[in-house]
Design a protein with these regions (language model features):
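ATP-binding N-terminal substructure of ATP-dependent carboxylate-amine bond-forming enzymes
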Residues: 1-102, 106-108, 112, 119, ...
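Structured loop/turn residues at beta-strand edges in well-structured enzyme cores
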Residues: 66, 122, 144
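Glycine-rich phosphate/pyrophosphate-binding beta-alpha loops
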Residues: 77, 158, 210-214
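Structural detector of well-ordered beta-strand residues that form the stable sheet scaffold
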Residues: 97, 125, 149, 185-187, ...
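Basic phosphate/pyrophosphate-binding loop/patch that engages nucleotide-derived ligands
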Residues: 116-123, 176
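ATP-grasp fold ATP-binding core
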Residues: 117-118, 141-159, 182-195
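Glycine-rich phosphate-binding loop of ATP-grasp-fold ATP-dependent ligases
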Residues: 125-129, 148-175, 194
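Phosphate-binding site of ATP-dependent enzymes
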Residues: 165-216
Length: 216
């Protein structure tokens, strides 16, 4: 098999006359690199691309995807998980791994996912949508049931998710969640083990337990 690693946003600035030659690159276009422990400066990353453009697909990404037998998606975060990249590949007729664009979009929006579960009779914690201004946070912190979770609807990897232990922390959560933008929901907090069960087609894979970090 011939495989190359391509950054979705940075892409490949220089492509040989025959792009197929890239698939024979000795290192698979994967030089030594390290993952920083701090969040990147996204504006600096954008400026590092020659065109400095805001588009999600970097130079030559789609051209290389068209030439691949299959695209293995190793994306993380909203742009990679909300179905937009999957939809673009599907429109181009490019085979790819993972969930389709519709499933990705539904799962990424927590409010839509909750409504699907309720409609299908799948047990899910009590929840509700929140529409409020900063001046309402104090009142809401006294009215919402405790214990609860505050979430933005489109955050992944617990981004925009808050687990307040008391009403003072709940008020802070209601203020802080607004920085993530989009809609906000509250959800009944369930204590217990956290298990993830992936489903491929109609086949459920073995359960995997997520052990949360312990606060100092």
């Amino acid at each position: 098999h011939r495989a190359i690693l391509v950054d979705l946003f940075l892409g490949v600035e220089e492509v040989p006359e025959d792009p197929e030659a890239l698939f024979d690159a000795e290192d698979g276009l994967c030089p030594d690199a390290k993952i920083e422990s701090t969040a990147p400066d996204l504006e600096a990353v954008r400026r590092s691309r020659k065109d400095q453009g805001p588009q999600v697909f970097g130079p030559n990404v789609l051209e290389l995807c068209r030439r691949a037998d299959v695209v293995f998606l190793g994306l993380h975060g909203q742009d990679g998980e909300d179905g937009r990249v999957q939809a673009a590949l599907e429109l181009l007729g490019v085979p790819y791994t993972g969930s389709g664009y519709l499933a990705s979009g539904v799962a990424m929006d927590k409010a839509v996912a909750k409504r699907v579960m309720v409609a299908e009779g799948i047990p899910t914690p009590k929840w509700g949508m929140l529409e409020y201004g900063p001046e309402d946070a104090c009142r809401l912190a006294q009215e919402l049931p405790m214990p609860c979770v505050i979430k933005c609807t489109t955050g992944g990897s617990s981004l925009g998710g808050f687990l307040p232990e008391d009403r003072a922390e709940l008020q802070d959560a209601l203020m802080n969640v607004r920085q993530f933008g989009g809609e906000i929901l509250w959800e009944e907090r369930i204590y217990g083990r956290e298990l993830t069960v992936a489903v491929l087609g109609d086949r459920a894979l073995p359960a995997v337990e997520t052990v949360p970090a312990v606060k100092d």
